[in-house]
Amino acid sequence: MYIIMNDFNGDDFNGDDFHSKTQHLNKLFNLIKSNKEKEFMDYINQLTPDQIDINIRDENGNYMIFFAIIMNSSTILKKLIKYGARLDVFDTEGNSVMYYPIKFGYYEIIDVLIDYDSKIIGISLINIKDHKGSVPLFYAIKYRNKYALQQLLSKDANANYRNNDNVNALHMAVLKKDISMVKLVIKHIKNLNARTRQGSTALHYACNFQLYDITKLLLDNGADQNIIELELDFYPIFYSVIQNDINISKLLVDYGANPNHQDYEGNTILHYCVIYNHMEIFDYIMNNYVIRCRSSDLYIEDINSKADIPRDHIDPNVVNLDGLTVVHLMLYDYKEEYDNFLKKLIPYCNLNYQDNTGNTILHLIAENNIWNKFDNLLNVKKLNIFIRNNNGKTVLDMIQVRYREIFIDTIVKSYYNYLNKYDNGWLLQWQNECSGSNLSEISEKKCLELIRNDVVNNKISLPTKKNKKSITIINDEIVHFSTFTGSLIDTVSGFKYLTKKYPKAASLIIDNQEITSDLQNYYQSIGIQINISQNIVQFEIKWIYQKIFMPIEFENTMQQIILSNKYKYIIFPISIILSSGNHSNGLFYDLEKQVIERFEPHGSDYPNKFNYNPDLLDDILEKKFKIIMSSIYHKNINIRYLRPRDYLPKIGFQTIENTEININKNIGDPNGFCTLWTIWYLDYRLSYADYDPSKLTRNLINEIRVNNYSFRNIIRNYSKKITDLRDYYLNKINRNINDYLNNRLTVNNTRDILRIIVDDDATVI
């Protein structure tokens, strides 16, 4: 028995009709499964469409039309269509009727189906999606059926359709490594830079699979090289460089690849050229780009400044996750063949920037005993030879004793040349007398003697500018066991600490424990239960599954803060929640300058493999604040909104700290200090509010390195400031952090502690 009874509606015909239809269908299924085309046609021609329902499936769930297609019988197919066969059905594996003729190259069947499709209204066979998310175009590309591909495209098949992985026809054609198919498809693609779920474009695939002709075709049609995939933050050229694909690498360079792009480890293509010793590509890049730093003044070299460097320029000061510039890498594995490259790069390098082991480029030049090769370049560089690496060694320690006097001569010349760059801009009188136009007041010989004395006896190899603003990193009391948890009470205590320390700063901690109705409803819709034992106050901006929720009474509280005229700054925590985990950011709002900065503790981008869609978050925040502030001031307020990529380095504080986990992890350390890094940064941001944020961030990182501080120790030690205040508040209600974490606080407890926090006006130092 072939018939599935559930497909019948017994009310539509009497028992005799049902019996005869069953017999006819069984006979037809027997004939078609036996490939008896003539007998099938003879039998069905004796029947009228009313005598059979050819849309009934057999006992295995198969439709008759699929047997006609598989046996490549256009005659039977046409007959079944004439008898009312449905074409919008799928086989037991979820494939559409277009699948088998395309797979097996049954061109006549393809033509029959496409021709019939053009005559009907409803679901189009051309673009029908199967149960796996594939469309006929995908079948044609998968099985390299160019005839089907041409026919489908000529009938306006949607080449821009994306499956569940966001893969479109162009992606598939490139993955099949077939340029003829790519040429057919590319004419119909609206967005050549469409990205898959993993963030890859067709150009990524072409470079990854070393497809030169396809890469060139894509570039000629306008493919964008400046798009990253989401797994490794790779740009297309990264695949080519790492695989030492010289031809495609050169092609991408010729089409303007940006040599300063970084992946998630902070490496650029120049880093990878050195790491894998792909020096032919390195040489080609060096010869096709101008080298420059972020300032035309050779004495001012900025590491990770956010000042724009044109794409046709090499920035030699880009650092990776290990704190290494490309010159660091070359010097750690020094070869004489690097000399010509080093001579080009050194004039534009910050020779005093320390990597994660504390070594500067100058340390490595000294260690390799090649400083004399670059003596003429070092003469015009800022040279701090007294920076100590993690082993406590200075640059001078690495110079062989017999050469130290000669080396100091180079340092003296550098010092002298640096003085002459600026008139009367120095801290000491004799330095001003030795600078620029003032040199007539004192002999050059005398100046060199004074400088040598400063270097040898005072251990100073760089003059200090007058009125220089210096940043001091406070390395707090050593904490071996931190109880900071990153929980809401820690966040509240941290932001309260900041507003106590900086009276001109305000946060949105108010005496109201309510949760906004939209947040309550959203929590219910996604099955999140509010923990009333830990609900102190909703003062965070929440970014939950890429949906934003502002704090309770947000606009009203903002208005009160602004109209009070007591505050210059407002600080906000941002709580980020994804299915893969939680994260924290912060906002710094300068009310006088009308500038908002979003701080991401990991740097300019989201943490690796934690894409919370920062661009959308920034777009929404910028728009919301402009609307709210314009409403408060009753006029259009033009807020300057700085995204992390506008001022933060690729490798930020927490990313650097994470590199120390294997060598510096204590019991009690949380999985991440993102909340604490946000509080720590806002502390320094408020302390140095007049600083450019890019310069502040750069100097903070540099100061931590120069002082040989551990990033993890810095943040762990800082935690005590917050946990002490938190424990003080908890002690006021006779509770401790364990009570809080174990949900032992009552609703009255949380109300009491909120009032204590709100009423705490005492300042801290």
From Swiss-Prot:
User: Where are this protein's ANK repeats?
Assistant: 60-89, 93-122, 132-161, 165-194, 198-227, 232-261, 265-295, 322-353, 357-395
> Any idea which UniProt keywords this protein has?
ANK repeat, Repeat
Annotated SUPFAM superfamilies: Ankyrin repeat
Under the heading InterPro entries, the entry gives: Ankyrin-DD_containing_protein, Ankyrin_rpt, Ankyrin_rpt-contain_sf
User: Which Pfam families is this protein grouped with?
Assistant: Ank_2
Name the domain of life: Viruses
**The protein, known as:** Putative ankyrin repeat protein L371
